[in-house]
């Protein structure tokens, strides 16, 4: 039996506390403990949540989603769609500037959209439908489509990775498969690259020339007023160190407190423990389709009888069942497209013996399975430990490799075999909003080299995803979602491990925290 407290001690034993940054009064600086080290600063290149969160601070978007998840104008003053739905005419708000004080122009937006369209799951949909984009003048541009797509505004404004970050044309012309090196942004915060120390601190200063909308904040839409001169992300991978910092008023906000420490934090009179992201995070076990053994669908299927989602969730976030939800299928539980089609593969009786027999019959040849594990993210570390244990118990030859999250993000881009630095499997989580519908659900993509890490080729899933885009009503969408789920149980591009419902913790001196999704830093004030 694997116990969570043992996992916590093992994952934190070798970690040391970072030096706390100083230099500004607490009244004008927000001290935030993020979920992990900032491994990349390119919110188009990376799908990591930590990079997306960074991107939402540094870059603005043309549209933003309100609390009702409907797109609203953000950088745009307005837009018009032609009667045939093929031409979208966009007009920028006046006075928009990049962090180098250069004006935001139509051609910057076009270049940014083009780069994003090569990497993002919905951006790729735009790439298929795009006829052309052209600037009409510095403040206006057109997007011309081959066929109507009512979801374009939602895609351009969604807060999920990868965001359509608006950056200067010279930067946006960087190959989408190469990371940018210039972080001149358009958002309410300016990233201080000169003060960044990986594994220690990331610094964001309020961009004084940012033109916030003169209206109330509405999740990712509306005004984005900033009430702090500086936000410091203080990297603390050791949960005990982070907890002590929050209790001792050396930090204001902890994004991902460890479940074992929640009772202690709840008893502290100066700390609020609150769920910010109502949709939660779907845990997934992801496979590499390019190399043995998981290039063999029978090997992937062999794991299904051994997966007990409750065991995974208890290891990840504890036995308090308000912090997780099972069962979980392909789509986020509680959302309109969540369904029970074929779910008995995960909810039926669990059997290690059945899994062993299936693996023996699959043709598995004892190939080495490199399971990557992120030591600085306890939820992911614990999911990986349980997954590796299950694999070993049914007969896999597992090589469990621990690394920090940033290293894992880099390594999972390696498409080579395991003896050339590649990998076989890893565990991660996807935000509930991302995996609530087929359009933004990266783990179900089957478009080969352009798919998410693992790179599966699954024509049937691509066909069903295309059908979902064309669905005339919710009933049709639900039928397609059920078909998608059935195909996932056959192809097994990933295995859902349950829905994590993690709270955040912040000091009572912090108020007006924006709820509904990720940690956001506009509108937040010190009481």
PLM features: residue spans?
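Structural transition elements
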Residues: 189, 322-361, 375-382
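Periplasmic-binding protein-like
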Residues: 290, 294-335, 382-383, 488-496
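N-terminal lobe/hinge region of extracytoplasmic solute-binding protein
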Residues: 33-83, 91, 114, 184
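Extracytoplasmic/peripheral linker and loop segments enriched in polar/acidic and small residues
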Residues: 348, 399-413, 439-508, 527
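Surface-exposed binding/hinge segments that line
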Residues: 125-197
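Ligand/substrate-recognition segments at binding pockets and active sites
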Residues: 238-239, 257, 352, 356-432, ...
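Long beta-strand-rich cores associated with HINT superfamily self-processing modules
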Residues: 506-527
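Ligand-site clamp/hinge motif
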Residues: 212-264, 397
């Amino acid at each position: 039996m694997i116990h969570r407290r043992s996992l916590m001690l093992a994952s934190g034993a070798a970690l040391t506390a970072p030096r706390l940054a100083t230099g500004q009064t607490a009244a004008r600086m927000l001290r935030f403990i993020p979920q992990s080290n900032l491994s990349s600063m390119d919110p188009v290149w990376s799908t990591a949540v930590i990079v997306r969160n960074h991107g939402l601070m540094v870059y603005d978007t043309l549209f933003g989603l309100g609390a009702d998840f409907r797109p609203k104008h953000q950088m745009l003053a307005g837009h018009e769609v032609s009667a045939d739905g093929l031409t979208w005419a966009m007009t920028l708000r006046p006075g928009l500037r990049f962090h180098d004080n250069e004006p935001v122009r139509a051609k910057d937006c076009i270049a940014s959209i083009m780069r994003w369209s090569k990497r993002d799951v919905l951006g790729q949909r735009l790439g298929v439908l795009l006829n052309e984009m052209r600037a009409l003048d510095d403040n206006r541009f057109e997007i011309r489509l081959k066929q109507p797509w009512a979801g374009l505004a939602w895609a351009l404004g969604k807060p999920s990775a990868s965001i359509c970050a608006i950056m200067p044309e010279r930067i946006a012309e960087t190959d989408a498969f190469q990371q940018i090196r210039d972080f001149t942004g358009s958002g309410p915060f300016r990233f201080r690259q000169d003060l960044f120390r990986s594994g220690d601190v990331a610094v964001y200063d309020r961009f004084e020339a940012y033109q916030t909308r003169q209206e109330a904040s509405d999740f990712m839409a509306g005004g984005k007023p900033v009430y702090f001169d500086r936000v410091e992300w203080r990297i603390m991978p050791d949960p005990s160190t982070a907890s002590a910092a929050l209790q001792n008023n050396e930090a204001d906000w902890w994004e991902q407190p460890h479940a074992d420490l929640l009772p202690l934090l709840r008893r502290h009179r100066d700390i609020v423990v609150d769920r910010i992201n109502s949709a939660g995070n779907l845990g997934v076990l992801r496979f590499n389709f390019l190399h043995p053994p998981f290039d063999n669908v029978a090997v992937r299927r062999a794991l299904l009888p051994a997966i007990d989602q409750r065991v995974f969730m208890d290891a990840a976030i504890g036995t308090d069942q308000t912090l997780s939800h099972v069962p979980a299928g392909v789509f986020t539980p509680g959302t309109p497209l969540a369904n029970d089609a074929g779910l008995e593969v995960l909810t039926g009786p669990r059997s290690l013996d059945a899994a062993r027999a299936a693996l023996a019959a699959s043709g598995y040849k004892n190939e080495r399975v490199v399971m990557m594990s992120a030591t600085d993210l306890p939820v992911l570390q614990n999911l990986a430990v349980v997954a590796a244990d299950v694999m070993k118990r049914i007969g896999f030859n597992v090589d469990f490799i621990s690394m920090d999250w940033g290293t894992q993000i880099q390594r999972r881009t390696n498409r080579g075999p395991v003896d050339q630095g590649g990998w076989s499997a890893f565990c991660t989580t996807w935000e509930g909003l991302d995996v609530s519908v087929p359009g933004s659900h990266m783990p179900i993509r089957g478009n080969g080299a352009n798919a998410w890490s693992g790179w599966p080729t699954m024509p049937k899933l691509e066909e069903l995803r295309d059908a979902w885009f064309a669905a005339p009503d919710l009933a049709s969408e639900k039928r397609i979602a059920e078909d998608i789920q059935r195909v996932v149980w056959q192809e097994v591009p990933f295995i859902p491990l349950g829905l994590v419902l993690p709270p955040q913790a912040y000091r009572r001196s912090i108020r007006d925290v924006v709820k509904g999704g990720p940690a956001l830093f506009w509108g937040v004030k010190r009481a």
